């Protein structure tokens, strides 16, 4: 009976037939073929003096022995006379196809590959064959350690590839299209698409691939298949790498940290993009005006300003925008949605850029320094604007009158003088203004008029108190909620003699002041700390001559001040040289003032 080979029992598909199978069918095919291969491997083993049941349960061990036999056969045919190292257990994996890059084969070793059955399951063991004695290799510690994600590697080439992934270095370029890659193997895989020699060709675009896995991944672009689904939010992705990066938005993991400013990122692409900001590198240039950008996406958005191609149009106001992010931010202006909230002060924003700019106010971070004067700024745009004060550059010019400006925002504001646009409208009277400063000045005038008329539009729903302006009303509301947003960072400061909460001090206006003469005899709304000051009027003033000798109702601190009349004053001319009957009040007050 002839021996059974793997090709006799294997089921082979053509490229067209394979493309018709779905994911579950392809997975089932692989499992069946692997199981068949394991069974054939175990049948081809010599069973003399061995436990058959044990050997059947360990097909990997059988496969290893079979490969050793093949290697020994090839070893006998080699011409250099060297001995070779067998493949260790941990390197024999059915799905492992990578060879160890550290071991070099002999020049006269003409083995090529060890083929077992179908080429789909062939294993390249050239990398695991070395010029050493016939003994097992001990795979010890991993000497190459990557500093950024704290990952260790056994071989230096793998370490260098990982290192380039962080630094963004891509020394290998495609000669046809100029695209750069981290490794030589990536260039070779890429060149297959240009040559069209790959065994797997895409039906939709004609691209060729040398690997079935890459072909199937590429196919998802055309079919729209997204097998990788996020369990937390349900969002699906075409690629597992994109899915892994998305999962970090839920976990908050940011493994790529830039050492210069300490900012961390979810993906290496975001890390490299941020690195270009610090380096000042702008590799992507507009072909029409020559303006350079750090990211190719920004170039595409900028090119729409030349072609006047606005893809996104607002249905409410008709305004057209060139980018999706700008359009989404604009829509929030109409809806009032502000999804980005500051955790420190509670202020919310409609765009992520505005939110990030605001965050730097709390952190005090100013990573951008002017090289000429040393002044630091929290944003790169602020630094660029400041540098123009040194150079005198005014790149933004008005097309109608020719006037030039340092920033685009100043040019937009100036353009309203020509168009007559007045975007800032008063909510109370409907009057419109060209500048926001004019609107604020107008609102202050309206508040001032109400003070004279006595009108109080803003009333508290809890206590019914009325206010002239909305800001005073908002401050008052915090007294009911107990909200205190502003906290003193220096906790070692000596407290005042009379500790008064900030919300009580806000009520110290002239109309409710206990010092005012018109409020004499009226009950004060302030706390007990100021109850003693109600009596500080002219008729009960302890410093007045008419009150000399009368008992004071002030606290113990001011008891010694009762004797401070003109006739008994130690500063009076008639009392010069006379011993004062006052205690050391001033020494006490002087020392208290310094503390």
From Swiss-Prot:
Determine if Magnesium is one of this entry's keywords: no
Taxonomy, superkingdom: Eukaryota
Compartments, record wording: Nucleus
Between which residues do disulfide bridges form? none
Q: What is its main location?
A: nucleus
Which Gene3D superfamilies is this protein grouped with? 6.10.140.140, Classic Zinc Finger
Q: Per the database record, which ranges form the KRAB domain?
A: 4-86
Establish whether keyword Zinc-finger is in the entry: yes
Give GO terms: molecular function aspect only.
DNA-binding transcription factor activity, RNA polymerase II-specific; RNA polymerase II transcription regulatory region sequence-specific DNA binding; zinc ion binding
One GO process term, biological-process aspect:
regulation of transcription by RNA polymerase II
Zinc finger (C2H2-type) in chain: 144-166, 172-194, 200-222, 228-250, 256-278, 284-306, 312-334, 340-362, 368-390, 396-418, 424-448, 458-480
CDD domains named among the record's database cross-references: KRAB_A-box (cd07765)
Listed PROSITE patterns: KRAB (PS50805), ZINC_FINGER_C2H2_1 (PS00028), ZINC_FINGER_C2H2_2 (PS50157)
Q: Name one GO cellular component term.
A: nucleus
Task: List, alphabetically, the InterPro entries matched.
Answer: KRAB, KRAB_dom_sf, Znf_C2H2_sf, Znf_C2H2_type
Q: What keywords tag this UniProt record?
A: DNA-binding, Metal-binding, Nucleus, Repeat, Transcription, Transcription regulation, Zinc, Zinc-finger
What does the protein in this record do?
May be involved in transcriptional regulation.
Spell out the family assignment given in the record's similarity comment.
Belongs to the krueppel C2H2-type zinc-finger protein family.
Q: Which PANTHER family match?
A: KRAB AND ZINC FINGER DOMAIN-CONTAINING, ZINC FINGER PROTEIN 709
Q: What's the protein name?
A: Zinc finger protein 440
What does UniProt list as this organism's lineage? Eukaryota, Metazoa, Chordata, Craniata, Vertebrata
